[in-house]
Amino acid sequence: ACVPVYKECWYPQKPCCEDRVCQCSFGMTNCKCKARL
């Protein structure tokens, strides 16, 4: 299952839907799927 935008994500277990970027704030924690520009 993929993760919708603005929700918590991590690889490889919970990748973002639609090839969105999973961006982490602090190292490898607090990662969220980014919205497209």
UniProtKB/Swiss-Prot annotation:
GO terms for cellular component: extracellular region. Antagonist of L-type calcium channels (Cav1/CACNA1). This is U10-ctenitoxin-Co1a. Disulfide bonds join C2-C17, C9-C22, C16-C33, C24-C31. Its main location: secreted. The presence of a 'disulfide through disulfide knot' structurally defines this protein as a knottin. Belongs to the neurotoxin 02 (plectoxin) family. GO terms for molecular function: calcium channel regulator activity; ion channel inhibitor activity; toxin activity. Expressed by the venom gland. Keywords: Calcium channel impairing toxin, Disulfide bond, Ion channel impairing toxin, Knottin, Neurotoxin, Secreted, Toxin, Voltage-gated calcium channel impairing toxin. It is found in: Secreted. SUPFAM superfamilies: omega toxin-like (SSF57059).
